[in-house]
From Swiss-Prot:
Protein name, entry field: GATOR1 complex protein NPRL2
InterPro entries: NPR2-like
Pfam families assigned: NPR2
Organ and tissue specificity: Most abundant in skeletal muscle, followed by brain, liver and pancreas, with lower amounts in lung, kidney, placenta and heart. Expressed in the frontal lobe cortex as well as in the temporal, parietal, and occipital lobes. Expressed in most lung cancer cell lines tested.
Effect of D214H: In FFEVF2; uncertain significance
Modified positions (Asymmetric dimethylarginine) in chain numbering: R78
GO biological process: cellular response to amino acid starvation; negative regulation of kinase activity; negative regulation of TORC1 signaling; positive regulation of autophagy
Species of the source: Homo sapiens
Effect caused by changing T110S: In FFEVF2; uncertain significance
Function description: Catalytic component of the GATOR1 complex, a multiprotein complex that functions as an inhibitor of the amino acid-sensing branch of the mTORC1 pathway. In response to amino acid depletion, the GATOR1 complex has GTPase activating protein (GAP) activity and strongly increases GTP hydrolysis by RagA/RRAGA (or RagB/RRAGB) within heterodimeric Rag complexes, thereby turning them into their inactive GDP-bound form, releasing mTORC1 from lysosomal surface and inhibiting mTORC1 signaling. In the presence of abundant amino acids, the GATOR1 complex is ubiquitinated and inhibited by GATOR2. Suppresses Src-dependent tyrosine phosphorylation and activation of PDPK1 and its downstream signaling. Down-regulates PDPK1 kinase activity by interfering with tyrosine phosphorylation at 'Tyr-9', 'Tyr-373' and 'Tyr-376' residues. May act as a tumor suppressor. Suppresses cell growth and enhances sensitivity to various anticancer drugs.
Feature type site, description Arginine finger: S124
Per UniProt, location of the Glycyl lysine isopeptide (Lys-Gly) (interchain with G-Cter in ubiquitin) cross-link in this chain: K158, K357
Length: 380
């Protein structure tokens, strides 16, 4: 498990009929001081309105995560059993990934109590100490844990690392598989995703995939967004031979990183050709500059492109952030016309977006804007 959510302590707290809220067990022992527990106990053994809810509280440079449980029955002292099995982490730790584990453990202990009085009987409750020890060690070591409770009950737990939200997939974005397409099995995806997978080739944009797969555009965007979240695809811009690119500082990684070199040369070499040389590929990337189109690059470097697929060259460069695209954004300098597509000429909408929204080709849009004295083109 990542160090960002390392568990420092696991505790079991309960409400004692005469002593009130107390820590019954903790692993390691004496980790939670009396002072810390006194500070947070109202969030560990809580009032009814906070019971069965995930609670995270930070105090004294520690973050405690718990899910207070209350089981009401006349067999218990004061007609209720109150307990909480929780985790303690550093105050700065990102603990979102641990919350489902805490919630699940609360549910398991509730079920075990209802079925066999596991928590309320002293003999079985003592089994919590070795269980908590295994939990602490295995979750910290591997992010997963299998807990045999008794002959008929086993608990399986796994920490699911939180992924950052991916960029929003737009109709003019081009999805590209991050690994070999054959590595992904169609059957593991929903029907919409299965329908569009054959059309993801690294060159079709989302709107084109929607049209050719005969799937509603918004459904395609949702499916691509899901693939993005799981890292199955990444997004690049539409490839046109009139496009302009320039290298980023990361292009230097191609010289320093052997594994990146291997991946790049395998990716960009033309099928059936002798393997491309690193020298040629690096020179091609460094030859990209403002004012140089892909068409210009092909005309100026026929020798270097003998074994290099220029489309794959651009695609790989974008995927690995070795290069970036300079896009054209039309800006209308007067406010006279607000018709479609003139309202898109604000400097906030790229050629890719405008062409997708209007159905115009790049050439048609270029001609239209070149003949309009009130339009200027901003490159960014």
């Amino acid at each position: 498990m990542g160090s960002g959510c390392r568990i420092e302590c696991i505790f079991f707290s309960e409400f004692h009929p005469t002593l009130g809220p107390k820590i019954t067990y903790q692993v390691p022992e004496d980790f939670i001081s009396r002072e810390l527990f006194d500070t947070v106990q109202v969030y560990i053994i809580t009032k009814p309105e906070l019971q069965n809810k995930l609670i995270t509280v930070t105090a004294m440079e520690k973050k405690l995560i718990g899910c207070p449980v209350c089981i009401e029955h006349k067999k218990y002292s004061r007609n209720a059993l109150l307990f909480n099995l929780g985790f303690v982490c550093d105050a700065q730790a990102k603990t979102c990934a641990l919350e489902p584990i805490v919630k699940k453990l609360a549910g398991y202990l509730t079920t075990l109590e209802l079925e066999s009085s596991f928590v309320s009987m002293e003999e079985s409750k003592q089994k919590l100490v070795p269980i908590m020890t295994i939990l602490l060690e295995e979750l910290n070591a591997s992010g997963r844990c299998t807990l045999p409770i008794d002959e008929s009950n086993t608990i399986h737990l796994k920490v699911i690392e939180q992924r950052p939200d991916p960029p929003v997939a737009q109709e003019y974005d081009v999805p590209v598989f991050t690994k070999d397409k054959e590595d992904f099995f169609n059957s593991q995806w929903d029907l919409t995703t299965q329908q569009i997978l054959p059309y993801i080739d690294g060159f079709r944009h989302i709107q084109k995939i929607s049209a050719e797969a005969d799937v509603e555009l918004n459904l395609v965007r949702i499916a691509i967004q899901n693939l993005l979240y799981y890292g199955v695809v990444t997004l690049v811009s539409i490839l046109q031979y009139s496009n302009v690119y320039c290298p980023t500082p990361k292009v230097q990684d191609l010289v320093d990183d052997k594994s990146l070199q291997e991946a790049c040369l395998s990716y960009v070499t033309k099928q059936g050709h002798k393997r491309a040389s690193l020298r040629d590929v690096f020179q091609l990337y460094c030859s990209l500059s403002p004012g140089t189109t892909v068409r210009d690059l092909i005309g100026r470097h026929p020798q270097q492109l003998q074994h290099v697929d220029e489309r794959k060259l651009i695609q790989f460069g974008l995927m690995k952030n070795l290069i970036r695209r300079l896009q054209k954004y039309p800006v209308r300098v007067t406010r006279e016309e607000q018709s479609h597509p003139a309202r898109l000429y604000t400097g906030c909408h790229s050629y890719d977006e405008i062409c997708c929204k209007t159905g115009m080709s790049y050439h048609e849009l270029d001609e239209r804007l070149e003949n309009d004295p009130n339009i200027i083109i901003c490159w960014k």
